[in-house]
Each structure stands twice: as C-alpha cells, then as structure tokens.
Amino acid sequence: MEHELRAVVLGCRTAEKASVINNILGDEVESDRFFVKSVRREGDVNGRKITLINTPCWWKEYSTKDTREVVKQELVCSVFLCPPGPHVFLLVVDLSLPFTQEHRISIEEHLGLFGERIWSHVIVIFTRTVSLKDESIEQHIQNQGEDLQQIIQRCGHRYHIFDIDNKGNGVEELLVKIDGVVTVNNGKHFETDDEKLLEVKKKREEIQERAKDRQTMVQEKTEQLTEKGDVFPLR
C-alpha cells in the first residue's frame, strides 16, 4: 500500500470538483468559478499524505474543438503538479444531470488528451446522490443507458458515490478503491505518452509565438501613431 496517494480531479463542473476535494481533505476551501490554471491541494487523511490536483473545467457537452487551447494544455500538464505522477484520475459526474451521448463524447475526447492509457487509472466519482431517490447506483447506471455504461466500462467498472453534504463520508472507502487501482497497475503511477507531451510542447510554443507576434504588432502600431502625433507616450 502506497503511503502517499496522488490524484488528478477532472470534470465539467467546478463546484462539484471542489466539493469532492474538500470532502476528501476535510477542508472548506471555495474554488474560483472560472480558472484556467490547475491547483494543487494537499492534506493528511488517516495518517496518509494526499495530493489532489484540481483542473480547469470543460463544457459538459462540448467537443475538445470548442475547448480553449490553454485549458487543454493545463489538463495535460496537471500531471506534473504531483510528481512523479498521479496514481489515479477522479472523474466527477453529477447524478442530477442526464448523461447524454454528447456528454460521453466530451468526456472521451478530453480524457483522450492524456492518451489511451489513462483509462486504467480512472475512477468515476458520482455526486448529488440525493438524485438517486429510491434507485441504487447500479440501477441508475442501467437506466441512464449505453453512454454512461460505456464510460463505466472504459474505467474498468470503477466508480464511487459521494454524499458531498456529509463531510468525510465515504472517504476511507474511496482510498481503498484508489489502492486497488494502484495494485492493478502494479504500483505504477500514470505517465503521459511521449507523443502527447511533444504535441503539448509544440502547441505551447505556437501560442507563445503568436502572443509575441501580437505584442510586436501592437508596439509597432503604437510607435507609428506616436510618430504621426495621434497618440502620446505615457510618462
């Protein structure tokens, strides 16, 4: 059993991810509604060091084509905030919302940014358990249809329900499931595909180059206007 556990938290709803992290760590830290930088949180749970990385959200039913490039890069680079790498990815899914085909495709595309091997490290975290009413989670998965079932299958049928209104409830059970993921993966943490890393590096360099070009263009335009007397330099 690993004494330290490292996890990256993914999902399309900021509040839900923050609640899951607070539940695990026993904190009451509010998360910014919109953020594009991954945030590292640490805590001690039953004598074990827990590191959780909260990542930027994507829109629930949007393709990666509609997600900002900076958000996609932050998702992929989030694994570097918990070196040497996360043991598990916690995919947060709100039970109060219908799970559509678009939602499934969006999840598959955004997790696909990490490479195919991510699926052997994913646990689905279901929140808003009050929405189950008299259903069991197994009945809910069945009733939601093929799209949710496909995600569960790709995750190796690993899932956990969190009553985020009751702090600490279900945390110990989740840690046992995370230990199970570590065991299944022979104690190895997740490592990003080299091809994906090169792709991210290339896109980041392209973004930096475009930003540099824009800055140069603005500076040149300002100098031209200053020479013409249309603007005055700030003192």
Q: Where does each model-flagged region fall?
A:
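A Trp-anchored, charged/polar loop motif used as the substrate-binding/catalytic surface
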Residues: 72-74
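C-terminal non-catalytic interaction/localization modules
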Residues: 1-52, 57-70, 81-85, 98-123, ...
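Glycine-rich, N-terminal phosphate-binding loop of Rossmann-like dinucleotide-binding domains
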Residues: 93-94
